[in-house]
Amino acid sequence: MKLSVKNLSKTYKNGVKALDGVNLEIGVGMFGLLGPNGAGKSSLMRTIATIQSPDAGEVFFNDINVLKDNISLRKILGYLPQTFGVYSKMTADSLLNYFAVLKGVSNKKERVELIKKLLEITNLEDARWKNVSGFSGGMKQRFGIAQLLINNPKLIIVDEPTAGLDPAERQRFLNVLREVGSNSTVIFSTHIVDDVKELCNNMAIMNNGRILKQIKPEDSTKELKGKIWTKIVEKADIESLNNKLNILSTSFNPD
């Protein structure tokens, strides 16, 4: 399996160029898309998921021309956006059952077995009969993984899934994603470096709508080794140091 993105560009009506000639080759396994807020990650995710159209470029997943045959892509796609709504009075079981019917699982016995399996994978067995609207942030994200796995997707897209999660929930979510990502092509966008280092076997760094580098996570910081350091200085010296050095960030200590 391979996802190919070729010269993808997108400019919004307000003049913001979200994608600027993006090229990527992504195979099976976990692929991290790392970049700050506003880098264009979500725009790229939505375009690959056929939610929005680009101004130019091509996207292929195996032999599917994604931009011209979005129906075929959606049959094998699992997508988890940054935020998603749920029906306020539906339990995890009833909502997964509803999604399974929508995705073509017509046999009731098959749906029951599938839902049980999905809740086990996502560690939500104990919450099966609870309303999803009352779930914590991490539980909702894991429920999102459960619903996207219903159609056994070959391409999985998860957009900033760990943002706002506490450390324990974040780790639980990463464990679930790690388990489901071994036999599919999974694109995982984040601005958290540790997420990519812990989870992904390949990655790209994105900013200002461009792919700056596609690289292995373990190699991503080698070029910077020995070139970045922290130093305590007097406030009065900051201006002169700014003129001599490339300062990434500063913080003021009143003590």
Show which residues each predicted segment covers.
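Walker A (P-loop) phosphate-binding loop of ABC-type ATPase nucleotide-binding domains
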Residues: P36-G40
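Conserved ABC transporter NBD signature motif
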Residues: G57-K68, S72-L73
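Conserved ABC ATPase "signature" region
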Residues: N97, V101, K109-A127
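Conserved ABC ATPase signature
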Residues: N131-F135
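Catalytic Walker B motif of ABC-type/P-loop ATPase nucleotide-binding domains
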Residues: I156-D159
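ABC transporter nucleotide-binding domain
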Residues: R172-D255
